[in-house]
Curated annotation (Swiss-Prot):
Pfam family membership, one: OSCP
Any one cellular-component term (Gene Ontology): proton-transporting ATP synthase complex
UniProt name for this protein: ATP synthase subunit delta
Main subcellular localisation: membrane
PROSITE patterns listed in its UniProt record: ATPASE_DELTA
Localisation per UniProt entry: Cell membrane
UniProt keywords, alphabetically: ATP synthesis, Cell membrane, CF(1), Hydrogen ion transport, Ion transport, Membrane, Transport
Oligomer status and interactors: F-type ATPases have 2 components, F(1) - the catalytic core - and F(0) - the membrane proton channel. F(1) has five subunits: alpha(3), beta(3), gamma(1), delta(1), epsilon(1). F(0) has three main subunits: a(1), b(2) and c(10-14). The alpha and beta chains form an alternating ring which encloses part of the gamma chain. F(1) is attached to F(0) by a central stalk formed by the gamma and epsilon chains, while a peripheral stalk is formed by the delta and b chains.
Protein source organism: Clostridium botulinum (strain 657 / Type Ba4)
Keyword Cell membrane set for record: yes
Membrane topology reported for the UniProt record: Peripheral membrane protein
GO molecular function: proton-transporting ATP synthase activity, rotational mechanism
Keyword Transport: yes
Length: 179
């Protein structure tokens, strides 16, 4: 529902990062801030607490991140607090990462297998996907025992499901239809 808004915030920060030649630094800093927020119950409680006013929340964030992140990122965080969107910072980070990939002619491919891909398999998969999408492929691998065997690949909205678990489900459906 708020993806459009997340994208706008991310694009604004990305443009500032580009102007300052600090895109990688901003992405790294945002990831760290997201991790700190996600892993700190205290920060989450402060951000959600209705009796702690916005000014106090901004003061706390300024104290926490003043010398740890770029001033422009801190300003961005304070705007998100002001607009009551700071708890959705991770979504803005994801959108910013998407923008980074788009601007650098890259695309993310999620791959699930039961065992890790061999170096040759990984290289072949990257090459084939690169040819298909005409972009540099960033492979994100995941081990998933539930697929039993085969490979599951997701690139954007495209899915290639060559897993044994899916084939078995399809066979089961066919057999149940015949009964």
């Amino acid at each position: 529902m708020y993806e459009y808004l997340d994208r706008r915030y991310a694009l604004a920060l990305y443009e500032v990062a580009e102007e300052n030649n600090k895109v990688d630094e901003y992405l790294k800093d945002l990831k760290e801030v997201v991790n700190i927020i996600k892993n700190s119950e205290d920060i989450c409680k402060i951000l959600k607490h209705p009796e702690i006013n916005t000014s106090r929340k901004k003061e706390i964030f300024t104290e926490l991140f003043k010398d740890k992140v770029d001033d422009k990122i801190l300003s961005f965080l304070l705007v998100l607090i002001e607009k009551d969107r700071i708890l959705y910072l991770e979504e803005k980070l994801k959108e910013m990462e998407k923008i980074y990939l788009e601007k650098n002619n890259m695309i993310l491919a999620n791959v699930k297998t039961v065992i890790p891909l061999l170096k040759e398999e990984r290289e072949e998969l990257i090459e084939k996907l690169g040819n298909k999408y005409n972009k540099k492929i960033i492979l994100e691998e995941e081990i998933d025992k539930s697929i039993i065997g085969g490979v599951y690949v997701r690139v954007g909205d495209d899915v290639l499901d060559g897993t044994l678990s899916t084939r078995l489900k399809d066979i089961k459906k066919m057999m149940l239809k015949r009964e």
